[in-house]
C-alpha cells in the first residue's frame, strides 16, 4: 500500500477540477477512501493507517492459529509453591537475612535442640485452647523461644515450599537491609538462647545448649624456672581457628593448641618465684560437646586498609574428624562426623551470599539450603565443587588442591559443624506438640485455600481466553465489508479488542466527529471500515457509540475542504503573480504602501487564515475533535491572535495611522494590491498620497531634541566627574590622604544608575538626585561602622572625594549629606585612628542590618558558588585543611610549582586568558577588610574551577552529585573544604555549613580503586560499624 501522505493526496486530487457546488456522492466516498483495496495478510507487513480497509497488523496475529492456554493468564501454578515430598522447607530472604536463614536450618536439623524447644512452655498452648483460632486471630509469638518453636514446627510439617521468618528477625531487631557478621551473630544468638532457656524448670530444656554445644578448655601456663603450672578453665561453644598460612583443618587445630613461649617483655609473673620468669602457655581441651562448631576465621581485620577483608585460601577438611589426639583426658569416643558446612559466596567481607550444606540426621542425605530453594545432593556424599566455581577466577588465586576420598576443600567455608558419632546414630523422631501442630494445620489450611483460589483464577482466565479466541476467530474473518453495508469503528478500539492484557471497553467514536456530528474526513486515518454484521455484534456485546454508518459521511466537511484546497491552489498561482508584479518597475507614483514584513510573509499568513477557517468549522458547534470547547481556552486563543500582527499592520503607528518609518514599508502597484486585498479584505489601506501620522512627527521632533539634551548633560557630567565614572583613584579608609579631612558617601544604586545614563544617554533617563536617605535607619542614624565594614556593606555604599562631592551638589539634588571624618586619638605614636560619621551610628539598627545580611547569606536560591579542584601534589590545601593535606590559599611560587601537574588534570585545561586569580583565602579576605571598600567584587575563574548553581536548603550530598557531574568524581571520592573547614556531613544543608554565594569550595579527589570488590569494602567501612548494637542479640 502507498504511504499515508500519497493516499491523502489521491483522496483529494479530484478537488483540483471540481468546484464546491459540484461535489457528488462519488467524490465524498473517494475523500473517505471507501473503495481502496483491502490489504492481504502476509503481503502487508504492518497496518496501513491511510487505508480504512486495511485490517492487517492490528493485533490479530496472536489469535490466529494454535494458542498455548498458559498465555491466557499470568498466574503461576500454585502447586509450584507446594513442598516436595521428602524434602525440607525453605526460608524467605528478607533482603540481607540469608546468614540468619542458614543458621536456622542448621539448628532445626539438630534434633536434640528442636526437641528441647518443643518442650518449652508457651503462650501458644493458651492461644489454641482459648478463642484465638476460633476467633480467626493470627498467632503472634511473644518470646524468642516461641518464635523458634513456631518456625521449627512450620519447617517440619508445613505444606509450603518456603516460609517467612520475618517475625523472628523482627523480634531480634535485625536490619534486613544490612548484612551482618555471620560468625558474630552465631555466637551472640547461642548466648541469648542459653540465657533464655536457663530460666526453664525442665532440666532437659534448661541444659540443652550446654549439653549440645558447650565444651571446656584450659589456658595452662608453666613456669620455666620452678615448673609450677597454673590453669584457667573456660567454657566454649565454638573453636575459632586461624586459617591464614594453613591448608588443612588439622593444622588449624594444632596451631590453636600450640604451645606459646613467654619471654622478654612478655614474661610471666610466677607466684611461686614471686618474680617474672620465662614460661610456656598453651590451650588444653578438657571436654568436647556433642556438636562441635569450628569457626574458620575467614573475615579478618586488615591493618593496612583499616577494615575487614575475606581470606579466600583453600582449607581441606574430612568428613570424619578424630579429636582424641587433641584432648587431655583420653576416655571415651572422640570421633566426629561432618554434619554441616556454612558457605559465604563472594570476595568481599561486606557483601555476598550465605548458603548451608546440612546433613539430614535421619536419612544421612546432604541438602543444600539456599533461602527458598532446597536441593538434595545426589548420593550420600557432600558435594562442594559447584559452590567453589561460582566466584570469578583471578590470576592471584591458587588452584584448588586435589582432595582424597572422604575429604573436601573449600575457600568459602567459614563454619564447620561436626557431630559425635555416637550422637549421630542415636537419633529419634521428633514430634511436633499438639498445640503447635494445630497452628501448622491452620496455616496449611490457609495455604490450601490459597491454592484453590489461584487454581480457580487460572481456570477462569483460561475460560475467558478460550471464549475470546473463539470470538476473534469468528469475527475477524467477517470484519472486511467489501460491497456490503458498512460502519466505521476506531482503530484504537479494535486494537484493544484484540489485546488480551486489557479488558474491552464500550466503543467510543466521539473523538472522530466533526462539527456536524458526523465522521470527520481528517479522522479517517484512525478509523476502520468494517461490515455491518461485525458492527452489530460489537455493539450488542460491548455497547457504546455513536454508530457511524454510510450516513455519517459528512458532505458539508468535504465541500468546505474542497473550497479551501482550491483556494490554496489559487494562492500558489497568485503568489507567483504578485512576485512578478513586485519585481516589475512601477509606472508613475500611484500605488499603495505595504509593510516589508507583510510582503515577506503574506503567503504564510493567507495559508494560516485558510487553516483557521477550516478549524472554525470544527469549533462551530462548540467542539474540537469531539471534545467540549471551553470559554477560557477560546479567550486565550483570541488574546494570542490579537497579539500577533495581521497583514499590513506592521506599518501602523501606535495611533492607528501610517508609521513615519519609511524603511519598514514599500510602494506596490494597484494590481498587486488588488491581488493581496482578495486574501486580506480587512487589511489597513494606505494609498501613496497618504500622509504619515502627525502626532508621531511631533513626538519624533521632541525625541530628537531630548536626545541631544541628554547627550549634552551626560558629556558635562562625565567631564566633571571623570574618575567617579571610570571608577579610578577611589578613596579607601586604609590609605586616607593626609591632606584630606573628610570623605563623603553616596549609595551604590545612585552610582549604577548614573553610570548607566552617562554610557547610554539616548536610552536612559537623566539622574537628578542623590537618594542617601535609603542608607539611614528610621531613626535617622547611619547603619554602617567604618572600621568593620562587611562585603555586603560595600555593595551598598561608595566613598567620594570632597572635590567630587562639591561637584555632585552642583549637578544633583542631595537629600541627606553623609560625611566621615578621621581623627587621631592618644599620644602614642602611631596614634589610634577613629572615624566619626555625620549622622551618627545607630547601634541597634546596625546590629539588625548585620543579622539580616547573615540571614540573606544563608537563605538563597540559585546562587553561584565555585568549586576548585586541586591535584595531589598542589600545596593549596595544606594550611587551611590539614586533615586533607590541602589549603584554601597558595603563594605565587606554589602556583608556579604546581602548574605542570595541574595541567595533567583535564579539569585544569581551561582557558583563563592568561590571568592569575587573586587570593581567595582567609588572608585575602583579611586584606579585603583592611581596604574596607573595593570597586569590583566579581569573581574571576581559574583553571580547575567550575561554577555551580546551588540553593541554601540543598544538602551536601546533593552538592556532591552536582560536583560528580561537573568533575566526574564519585561522591565517596570527594574531599571538600571551605575556609579550612572540612565538609563531611552529607545530610546538612549548605546554609548550615556556612556555604554562601560566591564561596570557593576546594575539591580533592581520592585516587580511583581498580579492585571493585575493594571499592565496595571502602563504601561499607565509611559507615560506622555498629554490629548488632540495639538488637535483641545484645539483650535490647
Curated annotation (Swiss-Prot):
Gene3D superfamilies: Cysteine proteinases, Phosphatidylinositol 3-kinase Catalytic Subunit, Chain A, domain 1. Its EC number is 3.4.19.12. Residues 611-644, 881-924 are annotated as: Disordered. It comes from the Eukaryota. It is found in: Cytoplasm; Nucleus; Cell projection, Cilium. Present in the brain, in particular in the postsynaptic density and the dendritic lipid raft fractions (at protein level). Residues 460-554, 569-692, 712-825 form the DUSP domain. Residues 89-421 form the USP domain. The keyword rRNA-binding does not apply. One of its GO terms (biological process) is protein deubiquitination. The modification N6-acetyllysine is found at residue 957. InterPro entries: DUSP-like_sf (IPR035927), Papain-like_cys_pep_sf (IPR038765), Pept_C19_DUSP (IPR006615), Peptidase_C19 (IPR050164), Peptidase_C19_UCH (IPR001394), Ubiquitin-like_dom (IPR000626), Ubiquitin-like_domsf (IPR029071), Ubl_USP48 (IPR044743). The modification Phosphoserine is found at residues 887-889. SUPFAM superfamilies: Cysteine proteinases (SSF54001), DUSP-like (SSF143791), Ubiquitin-like (SSF54236). Residues 930-1010 form the Ubiquitin-like domain. It catalyses: Thiol-dependent hydrolysis of ester, thioester, amide, peptide and isopeptide bonds formed by the C-terminal Gly of ubiquitin (a 76-residue protein attached to proteins as an intracellular targeting signal). Residues 896-907 have a biased composition (Basic and acidic residues). It holds the Pfam family UCH. Deubiquitinase that recognizes and hydrolyzes the peptide bond at the C-terminal Gly of ubiquitin. Involved in the processing of polyubiquitin precursors as well as that of ubiquitinated proteins. Plays a role in the regulation of NF-kappa-B activation by TNF receptor superfamily via its interactions with RELA and TRAF2. May also play a regulatory role at postsynaptic sites. Plays an important role in cell cycle progression by deubiquitinating Aurora B/AURKB and thereby extending its stability. In the context of H. PANTHER family: UBIQUITIN CARBOXYL-TERMINAL HYDROLASE, UBIQUITIN CARBOXYL-TERMINAL HYDROLASE 48. Interacts with TRAF2 and RELA. Interacts with GPS1. This is Ubiquitin carboxyl-terminal hydrolase 48. It comes from Rattus norvegicus.
